[in-house]
Amino acid sequence: MNNLEEFLDISEEVKEALHEKKAVVALESTIISHGMPYPENVESALNSEKNIRENNAVPATIAIIKGRIKVGLNKEELEYMGSNKNIAKSSRRDLPVMLALKKDGATTVTTTMIGASLAGIKVFATGGIGGVHRYAQETFDISADLQELSKTNVAVVCAGAKSILDIGLTIEYLETFGIPVLGYKTENFPAFYTRESGYKVDYKIDTTKDIANILDTKWKLGLNGGVLVCNPIPEEYEMDKDYINKIIDETVKEARDKNISGKDVTPYILAKLHSVTENKSLKANKELVYNNCRVAANIAYDYSNLSR
């Protein structure tokens, strides 16, 4: 750990929890800086942390601030990430640049996994993962999240992937790289706003204790890489599949026509969705994240008990 102190600031609360082998759940900061408007983004981040605390775990929101990987943000730092409009999304390729040049960066799934792993955190809650984009056979637009899942030992609890992606190809990619896809109490791979995508997970697992045991077994075997835990959006917040997919299809086409590509695609589509659905999609987004936080906290709690 000593050689990482040059780059890593772990909050006292998180440091103490890790030292005492308590449950800790990592959270990303892209959802704060790029996923929701201010001040709802900060309020949502605080609620995410609250949901984790209420389920026997310590939250550790991760961000890059002035060239430091911060693991566990205080209220002022959350406010800074939420209100500052000049914070870039930072993936694996950006990390050394951001740190060397003392920049600010919002952590994606990829960089949150890296930060969590450096700190010794094994469970991370997010909204949805990136994946293989539609038309990837032409653009080669494949999220770095998938590669990170293949090599970094952190479990990612999510509501599947947004249907802005090619979900079938995303699942094929996960299989190719040996990433287990578990469904928490479901056989279906969820599609973020909806509970089903038309595709299946690898295994339906009904308890967080079983998921914790799977993580423990995988890493004890020396099988490096994460595990994807798919936790569908609660039924009461699920959006109509045909309605949301129609809007997404139109917006994906619009983005292509405007030559919007790479890491600008998802924020563009999300902003459009929030506008067209009169913020119903924003409400759904928040609730699925809170739901993932609760499940992740329970997994982290059960996992921490294995090492006591």
Curated annotation (Swiss-Prot):
Substrate binds at residues 89, 109, 143-145. Its cofactor is Mn(2+). The keyword Cytoplasm does not apply. Binds 1 Mn(2+) ion per subunit. Mn(2+) binds at residue 141. Belongs to the pseudouridine-5'-phosphate glycosidase family. Homotrimer. This is Pseudouridine-5'-phosphate glycosidase. It comes from Brachyspira hyodysenteriae (strain ATCC 49526 / WA1).
